[in-house]
Swiss-Prot record:
Quaternary structure note: Forms a cyclic heterotetrameric complex composed of two molecules of XerC and two molecules of XerD.
Compartment annotation: Cytoplasm
Organism per entry: Pseudomonas paraeruginosa (strain DSM 24068 / PA7)
Enzyme active site: 146, 170, 237, 240, 263, 272
Domain Core-binding (CB): 1-85
GO terms of biological process kind: cell division; chromosome segregation; DNA transposition
Highest taxon, organism lineage: Bacteria
GO function terms (MF aspect): DNA binding; tyrosine-based site-specific recombinase activity
The protein's name in its UniProt record: Tyrosine recombinase XerC
HAMAP family tied to this protein: Recomb_XerC_XerD (MF_01808)
UniProt function note: Site-specific tyrosine recombinase, which acts by catalyzing the cutting and rejoining of the recombining DNA molecules. The XerC-XerD complex is essential to convert dimers of the bacterial chromosome into monomers to permit their segregation at cell division. It also contributes to the segregational stability of plasmids.
InterPro entries: CB, DNA_brk_join_enz, Integrase-like_cat_sf, Integrase_catalytic, Integrase_recombinase_N, Integrase_SAM-like_N, Recomb_XerC, Tyrosine_recombinase_XerC/XerD
Family annotation (SUPFAM superfamilies): DNA breaking-rejoining enzymes, lambda integrase-like, N-terminal domain
Amino acid sequence: MRADLDAFLEHLRSERQVSAHTLDGYQRDLLKILALAEKAGLTDWNALDTRTLRTFVARLHQQGQSSRSLARLLSATRGFYQYLLREGRCRHDPANGLSAPKSPRKLPRTLDADRALQLLDGAVEDDFIARRDQALLELFYSSGLRLSELVGLDLEWLDLKEGLVRVRGKGNKVRELPVGKAARQALEAWLPLRAQATPEDGAVFIGRGGKRLTPRAVQLRVRQAGVRELGQHLHPHMLRHSFASHLLESSGDLRAVQELLGHADIATTQIYTHLDFQHLASVYDRAHPRAKRKGNADGGNDP
């Protein structure tokens, strides 16, 4: 059974050319399914039935696994079984028709515009680390990059003269994004210092030794900046969420925000409309004459 799993992972890597992050996710989820099958005494994938898989998913949910994680596990299982069916290694898909337990969708955490400016407008020392960190923070917020997109960014994809950056997002899709003035200036201040560090390759963001920054290193730098400037923990995706929320709030153009974020489905982008409504409701509560009378004991029972 492990041989079939390894063959599928190699198929994903070499033929479908999925990212290392995606491949790790598939492997992690499918190893859980393999452990389930072995614990049940199964000797081939055809013996795993829908009832056993449903019970396993329910148990994981009771143990605290999120609906999102379980949906990903079922998706990986379906992909694996579709591969087995094509290869003639199996006659059915036990995950077909199964869905993860639903849970309320959490709204993404964002910074309000004033807090974003507070994070980015502080004094920046003219040294390697400070200039690099300022550039990556500005680019996250200016262009709404994912962490993987920023870490994977190479110089050849950056056009500061035109104020554009190209990134390779999910599904290997390339999109072109604008780079705002503040981010351009931060990058222009950073790149000469980068060149002095003898970079190993074309990575835009590197450490002192010239190596490309890892996702973990960027997460730590963003977190430290949040604590230092705002007194709160901050993660890269919060800057991406803030970019999307502030842009939608100002423009109202959901399709444009979808394109900039690289979402394949506009339903994914629509979560930011809920954030925008929260902002509008807050403004209403503060500014509308009738709203301000709520809870006012002197309001009486006006006709």
